[in-house]
Amino acid sequence: MAKLSSINKNERRKKLVEKYAAKYAALKATADDQSLDETERLIARLKMAELPRNANPTRVRNRCNTTGRPRGYYRKFGLCRIELRDLANKGLIPGVTKSSW
């Protein structure tokens, strides 16, 4: 199990990303728009820099839903590899079977 403080920190980041998502997307679109002149794009980049650091979606870490483990994460299931294997062997994940050939 991951440290509870790490899990909570990641949850706070998710909330911040959600809060600033629309503003961040609008500023990013303005900053990346090649048809605008350089000063407008620079102003948009400076406004993006004023947003909280944790409002950037790249700072959110995918974590296992059951253990909070940050590594070996399978997006399709929302689980780490260890929990995925454990639950699949117990038959608790519908449609997942052991491979045999």
Curated annotation (Swiss-Prot):
What SUPFAM superfamilies does UniProt report for this protein, alphabetically?
Glucocorticoid receptor-like (DNA-binding domain) (SSF57716)
Q: Does the keyword Amino-acid biosynthesis apply?
A: no
Checking InterPro entries in the record gives:
Ribosomal_uS14, Ribosomal_uS14_bac/plastid, Ribosomal_uS14_CS
Q: What UniProt keywords apply to this chain's record, in alphabetical order?
A: Ribonucleoprotein, Ribosomal protein, RNA-binding, rRNA-binding
GO MF annotation list: rRNA binding; structural constituent of ribosome
Asked if Ribosomal protein is a keyword of the record, the answer is yes
Q: How does it assemble?
A: Part of the 30S ribosomal subunit. Contacts proteins S3 and S10.
Q: Which family does it belong to?
A: Belongs to the universal ribosomal protein uS14 family.
Q: What is this protein called?
A: Small ribosomal subunit protein uS14
